[in-house]
């Protein structure tokens, strides 16, 4: 089973419990300077908290830690530069595909739905472009998860699985 927990970045009891229970971390970082700097601080806090957990008898062994650039608009001034900086900083920890900013995602969120549960709010091509982008990102995440499960075939197409989950 895959359970996704999305605690706030503050490291209170909820955040510590999520860190103790997790077998993998996916850290979203918008391609903006303040978010980038906040994430660096957050990573330092994660390292400190892992040390505290291990000192208190809770071993922490993440199968993967990945960073995903989120809400990315390549045409916005500075965001393309932040994407390049993230690639240099996070290197192999950064997913190769960023989550592109999209009105489709905003509209789905306002309706308390995922994009996979929503009908297109704009042109079908815009909706499909958003879905294709998310399928590519989630395919990378699924690959990371499958690599932790020796019983699962890594060769299975991620988009097939994402599509079946959405259905």
Predicted features along the sequence, with ranges:
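Conserved catalytic-core segment of NTP-binding enzymes
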Residues: 2-94
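C-terminal lobe/tail of nucleotide-utilizing enzymes
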Residues: 56-167
